[in-house]
């Protein structure tokens, strides 16, 4: 308290400006955040200088040296002093110039920030200079050495020991250099693709070894050829050019746009995207590049829309995307983030509408193409169909006019998908029409025969009182499923009782249950009439008006007359579960029970009994009583406060699965599973356990499946099948480096490679063995997925998604099944295994393994 008073009486500290050196260091750390940012700034400077040849050299992935050389215009001598000073630039002069800026850089912060974070040396030669100049700068951006340096026109910037002035960041940078390097190459790929007519190359040197090329483009004026230079010609074969279409009315309505908005041609989109055929996409989003006015950026909404539309046609893969969005510079704000990759757009909804309509149109036309295989085909009888080259070259439109017969392969060898869809839609519409009872069926299946037998037998079993009309109220196949087996299967899956309600309102009770009437239902057309069927138990018949029933007991002097209560006219309500024998009594049973009750009451007589009571004095103190009451009240409040804190509040329902899992992860540790007490097994599928006052239910199959799955993940070494000839992989230099560094992980997954150190980069690794397991086969696409996973977490044991699916299938088959009776030791073993798992809360297929049922303390309190 005294400290607080003394601090409040101290005079407020004066507000003073931070010294320029500290400001420079603080702000520089916010401009250059990573290796990719540093390389990006240097490459953009070269592009802004009009270079046609950019060469990037790295040492030890960029830890020791980053050097970018270009053949641009160079720097004039009068600009040497301001070259690395904060907010010194030749791109803009005032804020209004931002709306018209066409260069990558405009803030004048990049070189100044690099000087603050590393040792920077620049050599440059302008066209007007006779000889080049080499400049060395201090951390404040001041020139400390200036010497003549012979070189051709252009500029070379060398950055040594990046982040050396920030010890913590420098240590983190060195520790994660592989991940930083992979991100840098991803960023560099974007500039290689979009820089038409510019040759870009990158090499990396490890220690004193030779330089290894990372990426290289040939300076082609075409973006398509740049894609081939970076990712190989195989990638080009799976791409289709982007075709822009005006937004459709339905898409405009989805985005809340009017028809007049759709007429504005604000955007022009060009580029390439993967075909939607399964197998040509990617297993991840590692090759998606977006540009706005040829500036690489990360438009989150555009990226999400492209992937969502692609998943409508190929839900298991991601597309390769290169899209450039051209728009008036006045509609764009690029001054949002330090790296300029977050860009704000006017009329963004219109862009999304154009993009969605165009993608749907492209993929629809791609899906409707039927590729004709060159392999020999078989007709219905199994004979070979000879395919002529002239027939294969015929367009689809011509072939639609030919005979519709598919049996004669000579006359028609190609069918339009649209005609197939039309045929299938006609088939489904005819099948879904309700059949008339009088319409004969030419081919009745066994199921249809059963349904017909059920209709006839049901009609015959009903009495002749006009209870059920044959055409309207009989159970037939035209009014939904009525097969007893079908009905039983539906009820078994739904988990309801055995009474089923037909579409006409009839209730069919379980044959095992006993009720007073076999059918009690009202017709939809006449709800006032009542139908009665003979009782299975041969109970006495009651009059339709529910008249009085005279019941006589065995004793002559005692008689009783009772009125039977009217029963509901329709027992087949949707809530009807099951008929039980003891719930419905006949009138004679009711009469007999009441007579017995009267006999018992008549025989009971009250007798007065005199009891001698003893009087004992008792010490009593009002103060002690009040004290005890106060103490009990305090204890009750304390216990109530403890009970109010409930560890588990989530319900057992699919909507709260995530909340329940979070609660379990928070409150249950791995050691607690061994402390749980086994209560028993429920329904041959669940284990009931107790931990302190909490009761849990555990899915015996799901928990055993997850344990087996994790054991397979950790310890299984897949056996590989050697290939007849080594297979060349279409890998980039970065992906090839990741593969070589993680060969042991690939071998544990069943892949094996031969590495040729003397071969050119991107061709050093060749696949010689693939994992095989019964009916599971794997290929190069699984190698790509594993490389992508290892790029984010190098050295960590990873499994491709298809290997995980195989392990999940195996774990499911070898686990304890639902319906298996377990003894206490077996149940204890399953619960103990949960404490040995990394993620015990879900099975490999996503089903929950454990849920909280109740707290005994809360139940006893209530």
From Swiss-Prot:
Q: Which reaction does it catalyse?
A: ATP + H2O = ADP + phosphate + H(+)
The effect of residue 18 to T is: In LYNCH4; uncertain significance
Q: Which subcellular locations apply to this protein?
A: Nucleus
* Outcome when changing residue 699 to H: In LYNCH4; likely pathogenic; loss of DNA mismatch repair activity in an in vitro assay
Q: Name the domain of life this protein comes from.
A: Eukaryota
Known EC number(s)?
3.1.-.-
Q: What is the effect of changing residue 571 to I?
A: Normal DNA mismatch repair activity
Q: What CDD domains is this protein classified in? A: HATPase_MutL-MLH-PMS-like, MutL_Trans_hPMS_2_like
> Which SUPFAM superfamilies does this chain map to?
ATPase domain of HSP90 chaperone/DNA topoisomerase II/histidine kinase (SSF55874), DNA mismatch repair protein MutL (SSF118116), Ribosomal protein S5 domain 2-like (SSF54211)
- GO cellular component term, pick one: nucleoplasm
Mutagenesis or variant effect for residue 470 to S: In LYNCH4; benign; no effect on protein abundance; no effect on subcellular localization; normal DNA mismatch repair activity
The biased composition feature labelled Basic and acidic residues covers 391-401, 408-444, 484-495, 528-552
What result is annotated for mutating residue 41 to A? Decreased DNA mismatch repair activity; loss of ATPase activity
Task: Tell me what effect the entry lists for residue 115 to G.
Answer: In MMRCS4; decreased DNA mismatch repair activity
Query: What pathology does the entry list?
Result: Lynch syndrome 4: A form of Lynch syndrome, an autosomal dominant disease associated with marked increase in cancer susceptibility. It is characterized by a familial predisposition to early-onset colorectal carcinoma (CRC) and extra-colonic tumors of the gastrointestinal, urological and female reproductive tracts. Lynch syndrome is reported to be the most common form of inherited colorectal cancer in the Western world. Clinically, it is often divided into two subgroups.
What is the recorded function of this protein according to its Swiss-Prot or TrEMBL entry?
Component of the post-replicative DNA mismatch repair system (MMR). Heterodimerizes with MLH1 to form MutL alpha. DNA repair is initiated by MutS alpha (MSH2-MSH6) or MutS beta (MSH2-MSH3) binding to a dsDNA mismatch, then MutL alpha is recruited to the heteroduplex. Assembly of the MutL-MutS-heteroduplex ternary complex in presence of RFC and PCNA is sufficient to activate endonuclease activity of PMS2. It introduces single-strand breaks near the mismatch and thus generates new entry points for the exonuclease EXO1 to degrade the strand containing the mismatch.
Protein name (database record)? Mismatch repair endonuclease PMS2
* UniProt source species: Homo sapiens (Human)
What gene is behind this protein? Answer: PMS2
